[in-house]
């Protein structure tokens, strides 16, 4: 696994206000834990600890929300 911003299918981060929301999201996806990183590179976004390799993460490039 890796520590990273978990991504939605369009390479967009999950915006957040509370770490509890991110912890639930991350652990549901197989991570050890997660928290809301405030004022990070992509604003307030969920960051996961030890997220499985099969789960998409935010990478360089634009976020493509339809």
UniProtKB/Swiss-Prot annotation:
<feature type="disulfide bond">
    <location>
        <begin position="22"/>
        <end position="46"/>
    </location>
</feature>
<dbReference type="Pfam" id="PF00537">
    <property type="entry name" value="Toxin_3"/>
</dbReference>
<keyword id="KW-0872">Ion channel impairing toxin</keyword>
<feature type="domain" description="LCN-type CS-alpha/beta">
    <location>
        <begin position="2"/>
        <end position="64"/>
    </location>
</feature>
<comment type="function">
    <text>Alpha toxins bind voltage-independently at site-3 of sodium channels (Nav) and inhibit the inactivation of the activated channels, thereby blocking neuronal transmission.</text>
</comment>
<keyword id="KW-0964">Secreted</keyword>
<dbReference type="InterPro" id="IPR018218">
    <property type="entry name" value="Scorpion_toxinL"/>
</dbReference>
<feature type="disulfide bond">
    <location>
        <begin position="16"/>
        <end position="36"/>
    </location>
</feature>
<feature type="disulfide bond">
    <location>
        <begin position="12"/>
        <end position="63"/>
    </location>
</feature>
<dbReference type="InterPro" id="IPR003614">
    <property type="entry name" value="Scorpion_toxin-like"/>
</dbReference>
<keyword id="KW-1015">Disulfide bond</keyword>
<feature type="disulfide bond">
    <location>
        <begin position="26"/>
        <end position="48"/>
    </location>
</feature>
<dbReference type="InterPro" id="IPR002061">
    <property type="entry name" value="Scorpion_toxinL/defensin"/>
</dbReference>
<dbReference type="GO" id="GO:0005576">
    <property type="term" value="C:extracellular region"/>
</dbReference>
<dbReference type="GO" id="GO:0006952">
    <property type="term" value="P:defense response"/>
</dbReference>
<dbReference type="InterPro" id="IPR036574">
    <property type="entry name" value="Scorpion_toxin-like_sf"/>
</dbReference>
<keyword id="KW-0528">Neurotoxin</keyword>
<dbReference type="GO" id="GO:0019871">
    <property type="term" value="F:sodium channel inhibitor activity"/>
</dbReference>
<dbReference type="InterPro" id="IPR044062">
    <property type="entry name" value="LCN-type_CS_alpha_beta_dom"/>
</dbReference>
<dbReference type="GO" id="GO:0090729">
    <property type="term" value="F:toxin activity"/>
</dbReference>
<keyword id="KW-0738">Voltage-gated sodium channel impairing toxin</keyword>
<comment type="similarity">
    <text>Belongs to the long (4 C-C) scorpion toxin superfamily. Sodium channel inhibitor family. Alpha subfamily.</text>
</comment>
<keyword id="KW-0800">Toxin</keyword>
<protein>
    <recommendedName>
        <fullName>Toxin BomPI</fullName>
    </recommendedName>
</protein>
């Amino acid at each position: 696994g890796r520590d990273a911003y978990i991504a939605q299918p369009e390479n967009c981060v999950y915006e957040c206000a509370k770490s509890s929301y991110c912890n639930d999201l991350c652990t549901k996806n197989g991570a050890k834990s997660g928290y809301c990183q405030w004022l990070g590179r992509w604003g307030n976004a969920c960051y996961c600890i030890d997220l499985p390799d099969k789960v998409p993460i935010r990478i360089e490039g634009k976020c493509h929300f339809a």
